[in-house]
Amino acid sequence: MAMTVKKDNNEVRIQWRVADIKIPTSEIKNITQDQDIHAVPKLDSKDVSRIGSTFGKTNRVIIDTEDHEYIIYTQNDQKVYNELTK
């Protein structure tokens, strides 16, 4: 099943396999791109969710909120990033 990432005025919605993740846009602090598949999340009190298959993919889009970090593994990182930052 392909991953879908959609953003509207109220939330970001990420659907992949059986996961349906909703992140209120008001909680998003930062969105970045990263191509280091072996990068380690910052060590702090945040929870981390890894979304997508890491097999053969080094491109990542990272969504930071106050208490959570969402790491999206994708080959379409520019498309996902553009959707999230529009």
Curated annotation (Swiss-Prot):
InterPro entries: PH_SunI-like. This is UPF0457 protein SAOUHSC_02425. It comes from Staphylococcus aureus (strain NCTC 8325 / PS 47). It comes from the Bacteria. Belongs to the UPF0457 family.
